[in-house]
């Protein structure tokens, strides 16, 4: 387990001291994938450097299994660095070395005997699906292949922690998914704690267990993916599962933003809401997605016929939570919608496909 306690990091410049990290507190469970996201300048890279011990924090602690790594120096620090494998945004492979030689580099630096090193390199390249590229040079590889070599090298010393610093940035969708699947697999097989530094919310949603949002050097939100998406007030939740809602049509009283809470939700909840309360419901947009064993869902609906408080209370009984929606009246800008029955085949709904209105 990794514990980051009241971490501060400042730099001296010609114009004075700049504080980049301002009291970071995080707990990263063993075997979990934790994403750290935020805009440029939020402090993500600085935090990753402090975790990987490339830089010492100005104050605060980085504890791994209870040991304060930020207080170490010399041989003790070098020894603990081996417990942290890092995958960089650009693979940082040495272009004059073959793939096998690049993976072997940390083993050679540690003084591992040749035969053992060869076996370990072959094992790692086989694990990332590149054993057939052992004699190739980095210039002969695709971007995704280079990152897989980077993962193999990061795993060479059998780390307990894997730090991925924007490792999928700039990759095509297929290569990105291959890297994410590989990270998920090695996490499970090796029991690693994975820290995923990224700005891509699709990446976070597909692979992370929990997410920390950095803003201006502080943690603004932190929690499991499902909990954030289920919280209508969470900005991170809205970014993780965005909904592009259509305007509220004429004849509807108000809009609601609806989120799935933890636990099962009837896929026919729109029908149940309409028939149970006798209200008209317009589906303005939404998205439903599986995340492990959890179903994430968010929707924007328009309602007519009952007070908002009554509708919100009924939605809670269905395992949903609602807040005032973002849709605005479109009476002056859109034609009235033709009422149709909501989906009743259990298929749920897809964002931006159609508007379902029930009476």
Q: Residue ranges of each PLM-predicted region?
A:
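Helix-to-loop junction immediately C-terminal to a conserved catalytic motif
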Residues: 52
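ABC ATPase NBD coupling module
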Residues: 15-18, 69-85, 109-114, 228-232
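ABC ATPase "signature
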Residues: 222-223, 231
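Conserved ABC ATPase signature
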Residues: 137-141, 145
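A short, proline-enriched helix->beta-strand linker immediately N-terminal to the Walker B motif
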Residues: 156-160
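Short coil-to-helix segment of the ABC ATPase nucleotide-binding domain corresponding to the Q-loop/switch region
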Residues: 97-105
């Amino acid at each position: 387990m990794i514990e980051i306690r009241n971490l501060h990091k400042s730099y001296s410049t010609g114009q004075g001291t700049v504080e980049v990290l301002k009291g970071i507190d995080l707990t990263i469970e063993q075997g979990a994938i934790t994403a750290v996201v935020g805009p440029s300048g939020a402090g993500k890279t600085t935090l990753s450097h402090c975790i990987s011990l490339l830089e010492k924090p100005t104050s605060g602690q980085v504890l791994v299994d209870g040991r304060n790594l930020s207080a170490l120096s010399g041989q003790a620090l070098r020894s603990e660095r081996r417990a942290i494998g890092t995958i960089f945004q650009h693979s940082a492979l040495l272009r004059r070395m073959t793939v096998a030689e690049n993976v072997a580099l940390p083993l050679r630096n540690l003084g591992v005997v040749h035969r053992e090193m060869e076996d370990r390199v072959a094992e790692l390249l086989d694990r990332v699906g590149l054993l057939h590229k052992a004699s190739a040079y980095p210039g002969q590889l695709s971007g995704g292949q280079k990152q897989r070599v980077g993962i193999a090298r990061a795993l060479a010393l059998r780390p307990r922690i894997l730090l991925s610093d924007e490792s999928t940035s700039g990759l095509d969708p297929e290569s990105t998914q291959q890297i994410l699947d590989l990270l998920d697999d090695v996490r499970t097989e090796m029991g690693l704690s994975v820290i995923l530094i990224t700005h891509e919310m699709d990446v976070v949603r597909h692979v992370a267990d929990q997410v920390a949002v950095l803003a201006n050097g502080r943690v603004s939100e932190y929690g499991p993916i499902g909990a954030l998406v289920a919280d209508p007030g969470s900005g991170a939740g809205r970014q993780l599962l965005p909904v592009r809602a259509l305007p509220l049509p004429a004849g509807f009283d108000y809009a609601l933003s609806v989120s799935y809470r933890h636990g099962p939700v009837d896929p026919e909840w729109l029908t149940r809401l309409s028939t149970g309360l006798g209200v008209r419901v317009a589906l303005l947009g939404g998205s439903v997605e599986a995340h492990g064993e959890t179903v994430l869902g968010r929707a924007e609906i328009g309602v007519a016929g009952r007070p908002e408080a009554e509708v919100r209370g009924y939605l809670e009984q269905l395992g949903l939570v609602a807040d005032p929606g973002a849709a605005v009246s479109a009476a002056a800008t859109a034609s009235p919608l033709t009422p149709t029955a909501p989906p009743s085949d259990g298929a749920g709904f897809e964002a931006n496909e159609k508007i379902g209105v029930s009476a």
